[in-house]
């Protein structure tokens, strides 16, 4: 008769790493849940004592205040929801313009930092060392108070060809207004783009089959010019221009870029471009010098060598840190509250919050907006980074 003896049961002991791991995780979860419940209960209690009701119904109330700049129609009787949309559009406007201008200026300064010309090299170096070491808020305040607010009044504004007028009220310029032929013109642009894509595919297949090249650039350019031009001849001009004119103490008609927008955009562009310049410089220097020598040995001049050989390879190094600078620029747009530009923070998290008292809802919406903008920029740049990544076989 055989007796089977099972393995002895292990007792739970604090010295067992698995027991400690489970215990610490349980304690952490309980602590986080308890803290969350305390904050929620405390917030609800304080709001009840102050007579504040939670929820997003306040977005339907009338705002009752004016906004200096709005990209869509707005009156003081419109709702807080429309104020939110205006703040969002103004934030996106500054971010998009700033990203484009900072990228262009940053690339120019970055290439200038590597110029063999002593004067250009030193000027670019001074630019980088000065502007990247001054806080962006101080730069915004400088451009606003020391530059744009010191401009003359509209009656004595700087006149540029009776078309552009620069004064302390901002930059007045002609406005492009849609005419009857606008939508047919838009349709013609879409048709031209589709035609260019189809032509490019056909040309590539033809080249692979016969080896005979096709002038895709000139053919595509002709399509983009001829099709919209024919549409304009048939349906008329897509736009007509409204010129600004002085009436009383200010200009009427046309578009106006308010001083707050000009100061914010210029400051963020100059500040961010200094960092982008260093990213571009380091990216170019990361490319082996042998690539430059090989291009020169083929008879390529320095300009085409930089555009067609060096920059495409340097982009793989430039794009990741460039993404961070785009994110910083979008988030730094919130500094506009310092000069009263009506973007998300100053307009929605400032004026709307003060009038409604819905602090939790307003701040949550504002944080969600900046989070969505940052994630969108990251996804777009990551997608582009994968497109240009070096594929090894």
Model feature map: region roles:
Residues 2-393:
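Transmembrane alpha-helices and adjacent helix-loop boundaries
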């Amino acid at each position: 008769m055989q007796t089977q003896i099972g393995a002895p049961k292990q007792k739970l002991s604090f010295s067992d790493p698995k027991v400690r791991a489970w215990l610490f995780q349980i304690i952490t979860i309980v602590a986080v849940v308890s803290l969350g419940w305390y904050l929620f209960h405390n917030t609800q209690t304080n709001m009840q004592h102050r007579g504040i009701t939670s929820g997003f119904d306040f977005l339907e109330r009338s705002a009752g205040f004016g906004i200096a700049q709005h990209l869509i129609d707005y009156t003081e009787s419109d709702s807080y929801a429309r104020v939110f949309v205006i703040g969002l559009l103004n934030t996106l406007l500054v971010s998009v313009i700033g990203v484009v201008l900072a990228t262009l200026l940053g690339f120019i300064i970055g290439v200038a930092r590597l110029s063999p010309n002593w004067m250009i090299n030193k000027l670019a170096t001074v630019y980088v060392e000065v502007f990247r070491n001054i806080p962006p808020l101080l730069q915004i305040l400088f451009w606003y108070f020391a530059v744009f607010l010191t401009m003359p009044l509209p009656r004595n504004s700087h006149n540029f060809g009776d078309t552009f007028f620069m004064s302390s009220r901002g930059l007045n310029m002609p406005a492009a207004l849609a005419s009857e032929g606008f939508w047919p013109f838009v349709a013609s642009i879409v048709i031209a783009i589709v035609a260019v894509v189809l032509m490019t595919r056909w040309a590539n297949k033809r080249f692979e089959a016969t080896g005979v090249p096709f002038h895709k650039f000139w053919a595509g350019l002709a399509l983009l010019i001829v099709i919209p031009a024919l549409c304009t001849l048939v349906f008329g001009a897509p736009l007509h221009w409204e010129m600004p004119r002085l009436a009383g103490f200010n200009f009427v008609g046309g578009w106006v870029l308010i001083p707050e927008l000009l100061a914010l955009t210029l400051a963020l562009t100059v500040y961010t471009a200094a960092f982008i310049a260093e990213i571009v410089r380091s990216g170019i220097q990361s490319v082996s010098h042998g690539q430059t020598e090989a291009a020169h040995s083929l008879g390529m001049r320095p300009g085409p060598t930089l555009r067609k050989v060096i920059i495409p390879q340097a982009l793989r190094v430039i794009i990741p840190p460039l993404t961070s600078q785009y994110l910083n620029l979008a988030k730094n747009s919130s500094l506009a509250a310092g000069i009263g530009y009506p973007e998300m923070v100053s307009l929605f998290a400032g004026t709307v919050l003060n009038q409604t008292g819905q602090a939790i809802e307003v701040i949550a919406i504002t944080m969600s907006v900046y989070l969505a903008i940052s994630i969108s920029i990251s996804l777009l740049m990551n997608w582009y980074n994968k497109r240009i990544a070096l594929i090894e076989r």
